[in-house]
UniProtKB/Swiss-Prot annotation:
Gene that encodes the chain: KRTAP13-4
Domain of life: Eukaryota
Family under the similarity heading: Belongs to the PMG family.
Sequence repeats: 41-50, 51-60, 61-70, 77-86
Alphabetic keyword roster: Keratin, Repeat
Region called 4 X 10 AA approximate repeats, residue ranges: 41-86
A Pfam family it matches: PMG
Name listed for the protein in its UniProt record: Keratin-associated protein 13-4
Protein function: In the hair cortex, hair keratin intermediate filaments are embedded in an interfilamentous matrix, consisting of hair keratin-associated proteins (KRTAP), which are essential for the formation of a rigid and resistant hair shaft through their extensive disulfide bond cross-linking with abundant cysteine residues of hair keratins. The matrix proteins include the high-sulfur and high-glycine-tyrosine keratins.
Subunit structure: Interacts with hair keratins.
Entry's Gene Ontology cellular component terms: cytosol; intermediate filament
Presence of keyword Cell cycle: no
Amino acid sequence: MSYNCCSRNFSSRSFGGYLYYPGSYPSSLVYSTALCSPSTCQLRSSLYRDCQKTCWEPASCQKSCYRPRTSILCCPCQTTCSGSLGFRSSSCRSQGYGSRCCYSLGNGSSGFRFLKYGGCGFPSLSYGSRFCYPNYLASGAWQSSCYRPICGSRFYQFTC
């Protein structure tokens, strides 16, 4: 499987397992070591574990993709987070290339944290989502109105 992002083609064979997010997911992932125009980022594409040259941006995003080392979630650009994400919009405000959001790590800690590269931790204080931080993505069900990826399911092709 291959897809185009940032005007380049990447193959899943080069990166091992992959994670697919359905188009209904309301937020965005940013996972890139190369800046690119949001218009060149492909929605509904697969993101690969350890991939260093992919990006996922909302259609309304007018900023460049960022350069995170690990896959992270980011809030919509130039706006507050959607209420559908499970927390008040005041909990997450766009701050240039960084966002301030609720987050929860696998060790049980939670709260507000500023994440680099425009990343926004997934709202999890009330919904119990977790990160395999600093590795990969969520390690358990995201109990929000969005979607519930489970390790070992067809959405996860690798072990968190």
